[in-house]
Amino acid sequence: MSARQDTDMEVRAHADHHASLRLWLRLLSCTTRIEDTIRQRLREQFDITLPRFDLMAQLEREPQGLSMSELSRRMMVTGGNVTSIVDQLEKEQLVQRQMQATDRRSFTVSLTEAGRKAFAAMALAHEGWVVELLGPLAENEQTQLHALLGTLKSGKSKHSKETK
């Protein structure tokens, strides 16, 4: 879905629609706009896709490496998707696969030294883009929004009724 489609959906949410629907559409349009910008900049400046960046970010957090199944679980994608991404990054010598000593059918994937250096540059740029894209909100507004979204993420509702 393009940012334009998200904006159009938000516009179609009339004032008489429930506030929750309008909020959901606003969250969707903001998230899509930010993600589209980051995808474009990663592609233009580093010739890398967002899923490849995400996989490298997972590996940066775990220097000893991760199994393919753990990468799949953390990224919430299929094993086939992870295999394809790892294949691409391995060709570019940004990651390496090592057979697991305990299970010769499984591999541990880790960043190479070149991968660590490349990811460090990408992560620095990514952080700057996020700061820029969230810049219209003051720091205290970002803190408030973070707290509100944390409540939403936890699933707790001030308005939910206890049922017995």
Where are these regions (language model features)?
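Charged, amphipathic alpha-helical coiled-coil/dimerization segments
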Residues: S2-R12, D87-A147
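Alpha-helical hairpin
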Residues: D16-A19, I48, L111, L137
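Alpha-helical linker/hinge and terminal dimerization helices associated
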Residues: I34, I38-R41, M75, A118, ...
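Exposed, interaction-prone assembly regions rather than primary DNA-binding/catalytic cores
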Residues: T143-K164
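N-terminal helix-turn-helix DNA-binding core of bacterial DNA-binding proteins
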Residues: T32, D36-T78, T163-K164
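Pre-recognition alpha-helix immediately N-terminal to the DNA-recognition helix
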Residues: R26, T37, D54-A57, K117, ...
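N-terminal leader segment of winged-helix/HTH proteins
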Residues: M1-F46, K164
